[in-house]
Amino acid sequence: MKIKILGCYAATPRTITNPTSQVLEIKSHMFLVDCGEGTQVQLRRHKIKFSQIEHIFISHLHGDHFFGLIGLISTFMLLGREKDLHVYGPKGIKEAILLLLKLGNAYTSYNLFFHELTSKESEVIYEDEKVKVTTIPLKHRVYTNGYLFEEKNKERKLNIDAILNYDIEKVYYNKIKYGGDITLDDGRIIPNAELSFDPEVAKSYAFCSDTIYNEEIIPIIKNVTVLYHESTFLESESHLAEKTMHTTAKQAANIAKLAEVKNLLLGHYSTRYGNIELFRTEANEIFENVLLADDGLEFEF
């Protein structure tokens, strides 16, 4: 599982920082999570192929989280994209994007599907045989969701030496991967435990964008591999966090501690601060495994 940070700063884009956008690589998927202004430039800068992006998840309709979406959709069209594109986000996102396309007399060359969200309860919004995506209801000034991405590691690892020893044909490999026992030609039943190893522990990533401190999310994100949690302010500006419905680094760390997550990834820093290491310092007072997002960084778990 890899997380590429395209942008992780709050509010306005600058020449040296970008608003929120990330690429999550998980189980052969490449998900784009939020799409602040300048996202497509960052995708090019970091050599991420546009064609690999088939699902885009938008947390809320504040500009620093979705103003890059119409530009990206338009560029896909100009490049002759044919692959379907799925966009998940708050109700209203479809109207906003289609209006801009209509005013420009533009139409996509590919199927564009909008999955608009309205529920204030956690819900599964995407699932296949490898990955499940669930919403994390957040509390901000507008309707906002975070997203929980979970691997499905059902396949067991083949014990090739044992399989070759029993001269088992390849046609049965898939059965072994999914826990099946094998009956040999002489009638012997070989238990799956002899032919395979336990699957890798499934990894998970919780993306929590703009939100006030909210312990209600803890059951949803419990024990995740990585929690990305916004940390717009330091404790010295906690009054601003409350006023604007954002979170401090310490508050994010407390959520991580209570949820018993493995790693905490901080981001969405206010540009008033010149040194983001201050966020780690404050968070470390409560939680040990703290990572700092920054534009262009990649994390692998």
Where do the language-model regions lie?
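Active-site metal-binding motif and surrounding structural segment of the metallo-beta-lactamase
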Residues: 38-88, 116-118
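General small-molecule cofactor/ligand-binding pocket signal
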Residues: 4, 88, 113-118, 134-136, ...
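Conserved beta-strand hairpin/beta-sheet module of binuclear metal-dependent hydrolase folds
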Residues: 1-46, 82-84, 147-149, 156, ...
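Metal-dependent phosphodiesterase/nuclease catalytic metal-binding core
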Residues: 118-266, 277-286
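Metal-dependent catalytic neighborhoods of phosphoester/phosphodiester hydrolases
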Residues: 69-75, 100, 274-282
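Active-site neighborhood of phospho(di)ester-bond hydrolases with catalytic His/Asp-centered motifs
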Residues: 33-36, 54-61, 89-90, 205-211, ...
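Short acidic, glycine/proline-enriched helix-loop-strand junctions
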Residues: 85, 274-297
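Active-site neighborhood of divalent metal-dependent phosphoester bond hydrolases
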Residues: 81-85, 91-118
